[in-house]
Structures are given as C-alpha cells and as structure tokens.
Amino acid sequence: MKRSSMILWVLLILSPVLAQGQERPTAEVVGDLPTEMEGTSTLFFLDGKLWSCNDHGSLVLYALDTLSGNITDSIVLPGSIYDLEEVTQDDEYLYFGDMGDNNGVRNDLHVLRLEKAALASGAIAFDTLWFSYPDRTDSSARDFDCEAFVATDTALILFTKQWLSQGSSCYSIPKTPGRWEARRLFDIATEGMVTGACYQPERGRLVLCGYNMFCMPFVYLFDGFSGSDIVGGRQQRVELTNGVGWQTEGIATTDGLHYYLTCEHLDAYGITHPAQLLTLDLTAFFSSTSQILSHPTSRSFTIYPNPTIGIIHLPSQGVKAVAVFDVQGHKISDFRNQNSELKIDLRSLPIGTYVLRITCEDGQERGEVVIVNR
C-alpha cells in the first residue's frame, strides 16, 4: 500500500478525535508562491511589507503581495545559508536563524544579526551568535531541530521542533554576539512540530505555527501574559481544517487577530502540494478567552516510553480502553482498564508505526501515534 494510503487510514482511525472540541478554523489560500519561493521558511513584516526567504542557498529576502503572493521586491544579502528557518526582529536588529537540523547532526548552529539601518545604507555586516544545547544527546538529537524563535527585550527565545517527541522545548540565549549554551526554560505539549513564531509583546500575545507528522497544520496560542513571561497567561492549541499536506513554515500579523502564513512546497509520501501564501482569522479564539486552557504544558496523561522496544504504559485514571491499529487501518488488539496502570504489550509486533485509539472514561476518544523501534 502506498504511504499516502497509509496516512489516510491513520486519519480515519483518528477522525473521532479530530471532530471534537471548538470549531476549527481554515487557513484560506491567497495564492501560490512563485518558484523562487518554494522553500519559504519564515514570514515577517518590515517597513510595511510582508517578507519571506528560502531555507537554503543564497540569502535573499522577498517581499510578497498580500493579495496574490507574487514577489514585489527583493533584497540580496551577502553570503549563503545552510538551513535558515526563521527571521525575527527587535527595534534595532534583524536576526536570521540558521538553526535547522532535521537529522540532529549540526555543530554549527548560529544566528546572524544585522542592523536594520544597514539595509538602507547598503553597508551589510553580520554579527554571529553561536549556540549549542547542553542537554542534547545522540539519542535525542532529532528533538533539537529549531525553526522558530523570537526576540524579547533581553534574549532570543528558541522553540525546538521535536521530530521524536512531537512537542517543543523553549530555550533562551543572549542577544549579543558570542558563543552560548542555550538555557532550557519550559516545555510545550504542542502535539506537533513547531515551525514559526509571531511575537507581539505589546498585546501579550505569541502565536506558533506548525504541523503534525501527517503535515496537518495547527497554531498554538499564548495570550494574556505580561512582558516576556510567555507562560504567564493562557494557552491553546488550535488545529486547522486544511487537512494533509499543508507544511506551514512562517507566520506574521499586523493586528494580532488576522495572520498570514506560508506553506512550503511538498512532494513526498505520494502527496504534492504547492508553496502558498495563506490567511488565517483567529479573532474568535482570542475573543473567547474562557475556552483557552490555562498552562497546558503537559498532556492530560503520558504514554511512555515512545518510541518503545515493546511495552508502553498509560495511567489507569481517566482511561477506559485502548485499541491498537497498524497504519493500514487493521485493528491488532484491544486492552481494557483493570483499575491499575495499563501496560500495552507490543513485543509481538514488527518494528514500525502504530496508532492507539484511546477511549476515556468520559466517552471521548483521542489518538496517539507510537513507534516500535528495537
């Protein structure tokens, strides 16, 4: 069976979960991006224009028409990039994050800092902020990709893209040139990979964008905080209705309610999707603050270990039953809660990806992807 068919089976397994909760918004297509922008990796406003750039090759900034996605201007900067995934800014500087690390092998992660005034004068000179993660290990390296960061008054705040854990950890480094060890601040249960960030300290608001392992997009909202205390307010994860294949990469806004996103060209797993400029209206989610969860920095229950060599554990409280499916949609086994910690024995299964449909005591269902890897 083709990989795309497998993905559709998994989505059918998870469909009861996806249908629950507040009505999900849709990111509307403004237009396809030109071929020059197929590797779009970021999005930001500067001097009244919406800008993006690609994640590799020459460092060129492209201004996009917000009504069509067409290129209206460009700025060629000196040098080249390896995997530039985000551009952020403060009042004085632009920060270019060459910190993408899909395979967890880079030892040259860095941020290029450029004075905004240099764009007008043409005297382009970058400072470099080198950094590393002190808690990165060989086995966890793929959880230390990073495609989103923001600049506060005192530091750069990085949000990791976790290929293994499907969450994000937040780190900080100083805003000045040098060599730094990133300091871990907190973890976020994004249930997907974070790829972009839009920080609005004057509104006490931060919005992350990303997608899950099926390239289904989501945004993660922080709202109601003061200063740089990002976790001092409310948080909410919002899934979009766009479906499979939307590899969202950048996010930007001018009013804090209506957002622009870009999605990168995708041609993998039997899925082809063009690079596009999108719009997303989040007005209802910031108005209905009573529906925003307070500090959901961990899931309601934890499945561990994942990946596993055979046995995974779930707490008994809140869980009624668990069904195990393969990615073709075939049910493999059922487990019932016997008022003790649930142990799901997968030792008889071959190495691969499986889906758990978890039935909770309140009747709701949720899905979790587990990986058997020996």
Where are each of the predicted segments found?
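Sequence/structural signature of beta-propeller domains
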Residues: 22-288
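Bacterial Sec-dependent N-terminal signal peptides
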Residues: 1-28
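Short coil/turn motif common to extracellular beta-sandwich-like domains
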Residues: 305-313
